[in-house]
Curated annotation (Swiss-Prot):
Name used for this protein in its record: Pseudouridylate synthase RPUSD4, mitochondrial
Superkingdom in the source lineage: Eukaryota
An annotated GO BP: mRNA processing
Keywords, comma-separated and alphabetical: Cytoplasm, Isomerase, Mitochondrion, mRNA processing, mRNA splicing, Nucleus, rRNA processing, Transit peptide, tRNA processing
Active site: 153
Pfam families: PseudoU_synth_2
Localization per record: Mitochondrion matrix; Nucleus; Cytoplasm
Quaternary context: Interacts with 16S mt-rRNA, mt-tRNA(Phe) and mt-tRNA(Met). Forms a regulatory protein-RNA complex, consisting of RCC1L, NGRN, RPUSD3, RPUSD4, TRUB2, FASTKD2 and 16S mt-rRNA.
PROSITE patterns, sorted: PSI_RLU
Annotated catalysed reactions: uridine in 5S rRNA = pseudouridine in 5S rRNA; a uridine in tRNA = a pseudouridine in tRNA; a uridine in mRNA = a pseudouridine in mRNA
Disordered: region residues: 51-70
Name of the top EC class for this enzyme: isomerase
Length: 377
């Protein structure tokens, strides 16, 4: 409580690392008596503005990292934050610059990192919000909105298919549902799987993790277990879903590998769960599935941290290295041929490959080419 005309430069807010008030400053002003302080309400708006300004000043005072990797990680974090704050027109224009295919039926974009496909709690802007604007950019002001044909996780980059007509979108969705679409992903994993090629065929179910932080995760629900050297069938959860993933190591070093993943089924977080819990090779930057009991930044070995030029305390900003690199659609009409769509990985993905000593196959993508579409990070 402060009397009119009394400035309180020492006011600070306690709670969440900020301060609530300085009594010494409050009583050091002769005009700021206790009676006057009790008579007027505090201007909450001015206090909030002051706190925001102080917080912004603290951010600007933080020294810029000299390490190029840490600098790029910070830039990526800021880029994803900006994606949630930009005007829908700006986001739609950025997506239009990342188009990899367009015809009378479909539009295919290279989805950037950190952008959700659908809305939800805490989501300020998503791809579905800007589809009407994107359609107008491509086909003029009278264009009807584009339609989503499938989804990718917020942290996953790469091929994403949109349709001009709702009927075509339903047709493509049915192709996904009946597993007629061939999907290929690239993933950088922590450690190298053994064997280097194979199939992970383990059902997946969602469960609550009983740790310090109660949360839900997808996890394995095996149909068999080993008992005295023998494989014994077990009763699986009624909620478990069939999940099958083909994988192959494309390049490897002592501590990491580049994998090509081909999901045969399409279960939520299937690739992340199979890599982490099935092969014990979590995807680089997967802070959710690197540990079952905790929600914590991924813990990396000293060797990987050294190659990436990161400290463990900064690992929480490391993005998920999972990229939808290729998608093959069957012919939508009898007179047409199947459509194979390719997307180059984002810049941070290519940089991590180089630092970890991993090679990107030249038959699909050239490492010497520009790593990302215009506007992608």
């Amino acid at each position: 409580m402060v009397a009119p005309g009394c400035s309180v430069p020492g006011l600070w807010v306690r709670g969440f690392g900020q301060c609530l008030g300085s009594l010494f400053t409050l009583f050091s002003k002769p005009l700021c008596s206790a009676a006057a302080a009790a008579s007027q309400p505090l201007d909450a708006q001015r206090l909030a503005e002051r706190l925001r300004a102080q917080k912004q000043q603290q951010k600007t005072k933080e020294p810029a990292p000299t390490n190029p990797v840490q600098r790029r990680v910070r830039e990526l974090v800021r880029f994803t934050e900006q994606l949630q704050r930009v005007h829908p027109n700006v986001l739609a224009k950025a997506l239009s610059r990342g188009i990899v295919h367009q015809d009378k039926e479909l539009v295919v974009i290279n989805k950037p990192y950190g952008l959700p496909v659908h809305g939800g709690p805490g989501v300020k802007l998503c791809i579905s919000d800007v589809l009407p604007v994107l359609a107008k950019i491509l086909h003029g002001p009278k264009a009807k909105p584009l339609h989503l044909c499938h989804r990718l996780d917020k942290e996953t980059t790469g091929v994403m298919v949109l349709a001009w007509e709702k009927e075509v979108a339903h047709q493509v969705q049915e192709l996904f549902r009946t597993r007629q679409v061939t999907k290929k992903y690239w993933a950088i994993t922590v450690r190298v799987p053994v064997p280097e090629a194979g199939v992970v065929d383990i059902p997946i179910v969602e469960k609550e993790a009983q740790g310090q932080q109660h949360h839900h995760k997808m996890t394995l629900s095996p149909s068999y277990r080993m008992d005295d050297g023998k494989m014994v069938r077990v009763r699986s959860s009624r909620n478990a879903q069939l999940a099958v993933t083909q994988y192959q190591v494309l390049s490897s070093s002592l501590s990491a590998a580049l994998l090509e993943l081909q999901p045969i089924t399409g279960i939520k977080h299937q690739l992340r769960v199979h890599m982490s819990f099935g092969l014990d090779c979590p995807i680089l930057g997967d802070h959710k599935y690197s540990d079952w009991n905790r929600l914590a930044p991924q813990k990396l070995s000293a060797g990987i941290l050294k190659k990436l030029g990161l400290q463990q305390s900064k690992a929480r900003h490391l993005p998920l290295h999972l990229h939808a690199c290729q998608l093959t659609l069957p012919a939508l009409q009898p007179q047409k041929e199947e459509l194979t769509l390719l997307c180059r990985p984002p810049r941070y993905f290519v940089n991590s490959l180089r630092r970890l000593g991993l090679k990107m196959p030249s038959r699909d993508h050239s490492a010497d080419e520009e790593a990302a579409q215009p506007g992608a990070q």
